[in-house]
Amino acid sequence: MTESTKIKYCRADSGSGSKPLSAETKTRLMADGKKIDEEKKDGTAVRRVLFWFAVLVIRFALLMAMHYYHDVTSSRCDGARAGGARTGRSALSRVRGRRRGGGTPDTRPYCDSGTACLDFRKGGCNHGDACEFAHGVFDNSSADLA
């Protein structure tokens, strides 16, 4: 019996005898890479690979863009910038202020600096919210990092 007659008929899933296979099923059942050669000639395999590559590249680019948008740091924190434009967390807090009450937006200056304020660490910073350095909880022990 030849290869083509072996795969010409196959038992159906319902169990009611044999029925002819479709051309797509025949190509799935073929061995020794014949299906791969057919797809290479047709170009469907290449298109499929390019499609998934494009999907992954776009997904990665969007995720990285979102990461960098939320990780914006500024060296100066002077409240309103040129034309009232803000970046990073300042812009996000302003939007949140609009959403909360619908009234006036949150216009407080918010500093995104990652550098710790030395005066705040010592006990008091005279600049308050207008300070260009970060205020918050900082780990003073560098032994944990090693």
From Swiss-Prot:
Molecular function via GO: DNA binding; zinc ion binding
InterPro entries with a match to the protein in the record: Znf_CCCH
Region Disordered: start-end pairs: 80-106
Disulfide-linked positions: none
Zinc-finger keyword on record: yes
SMART domains: ZnF_C3H1
Pfam family, one: zf-CCCH
Top-level lineage group: Eukaryota
Keyword DNA-binding appears in the UniProt entry: yes
Protein's name in the database: Putative zinc finger CCCH domain-containing protein 29
Organism for this UniProt entry: Oryza sativa subsp. japonica (Rice)
